[in-house]
Amino acid sequence: MAESTSSGIKRVLSIQSHVVHGYVGNKVATYPLQLLGFDVDPLNSVQFSNHTGYKTFKGPVSNEKELATIFEGLEENELLPLYSHLLTGYIGNPLFLRQVGHIVKKLRQANPGLVYVCDPVMGDNGQLYVPKELLPVYRDEIIPLADILTPNQYEVELLTEKEVRSEAAVWEAMDWFHKRGIKTVVISSSDLGQPGVLRAFLSQVNGPRLAIDIPKQGGKDLVFTGTGDLFASLFLAHSHDSKDMASVFEKTIASLQAVIKRTVAALPNGGNGPVKAAERELKLVQSKTEIEQPQVLLKAQRLN
């Protein structure tokens, strides 16, 4: 029998995308988790040459049968009790996502203390980039299984089927998720801050309601890919090590902003002007120190 998590092992099964070049999905999640003391077993939902923000991308998309086969191998070798966490990100196939639901249940049978962190990657800035058929699977089958949810503002609107255009609407949405069994919900970014400022929110059942204002970096039209994936992995790590949600939230944002700052600094003209997709890849490896030792500059505001 494989050693169980009762011995203090920190191991993540991470089911999301993989790219050969660049940093999104498992490529951006694995390194920070390892730096913060976790073993990571990446299971790829797709394997692309690069992320989809380039002019072209190539590579295969995994299906639910391939996922089931790989997981079966883990199960037959009695490895399931080793996992302390499940992390899921980009999944583009509704049947693949449904299979993830079966995986959550099997992992919980092997380790009732498993923590499931779900990043429901579906779109951003009003643009849906997965098949709409994923929505009911997330809403009805996956969301109720999650312990921690890390959507962006647009994904919150997709899941709740309500616009989120005010802070009152944010807390209504948070309550919608809590009623479905999710203990901790973090909206990783929203446009509800002042001009030039993103606003992130956190809500925990019987816990604090928090917000952090995050100044945008670089040119006004500069967009980075993989930041949500990085956010989810950092939040997973810090929430395991501390139950102080304000501190967890602050450290997550601190490391994320440090990575973005280093990335912007490497851009031509600081990102003011045209920037190629390859130039916008996150400077992850170069940010090792900021990931291991986050310097908190942006403090959480308690709103309850």
Model-derived segments and their meaning:
Residues 1-62, 291-304:
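Glycine-rich phosphate/adenosyl-contacting loop at the front of the ribokinase-like
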Residues 58-76:
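Glycine-rich, highly charged phosphate/nucleotide-binding loops
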Residues 80-108, 120-124:
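N-terminal glycine-rich phosphate/adenylate-binding segment common to multiple enzyme folds
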Residues 107-116, 180-183:
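A short helix->loop->beta-strand "cap" motif at the edges of active sites that frequently abuts
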Residues 129-211, 218-220, 241-246:
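Conserved phosphate/ATP/ADP-binding segment of small-molecule kinases
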Residues 214-235:
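Short glycine/threonine-rich catalytic loop with a Thr-x-Gly-x-Asp
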Residues 233-241, 254, 258:
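Short glycine/serine- and small hydrophobic-enriched flexible loop segments
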Residues 246-304:
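Charged C-terminal helix
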